[in-house]
């Protein structure tokens, strides 16, 4: 199975149109009511079209979550050192704009509320309480899709920290 398992009925698309002065990319975003496919992943990895995955699934559970730190320029070394010092099970990846995504990957799917709360505690411990956390939703009403996160490894961008 995929490392980024999520909602099966929808995904996100991000098309870059420009860049702000602070380095954050601007673009057209849309949620597509179709499942994530291998072809979409290939297009993403080849740098053809960005892919977003919704971490909360149809059972209101998650296999992964993410702390999204939007600070430019990002203090990569400082945050990575703190993650190691605290023994947090997080993987640092560059975001599309050069910010930081700290991913938590799980062996089993857990309630989105538990994943969200755990990541809030981790973010606070790292000194970034109040930053964006995925999953954003802890439950989905019928027909809702939730918020998606741009996936890492788009073309030659969004690399894992240490692979810069």
Language-model regions: role of each:
Residues 75-85, 105-131, 157-164:
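Helical (often loop-to-helix) elements that flank the catalytic cores of nucleotide-handling enzymes
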Residues 1-64, 72-79, 147-148, 153-156, ...:
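DNA replication initiation on ssDNA origins
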Residues 33-37, 94, 117-123:
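A signal for specific C-terminal beta-sheet/loop modules enriched in small/flexible residues
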Residues 5-9, 88-92, 130-131:
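Short secondary-structure junctions
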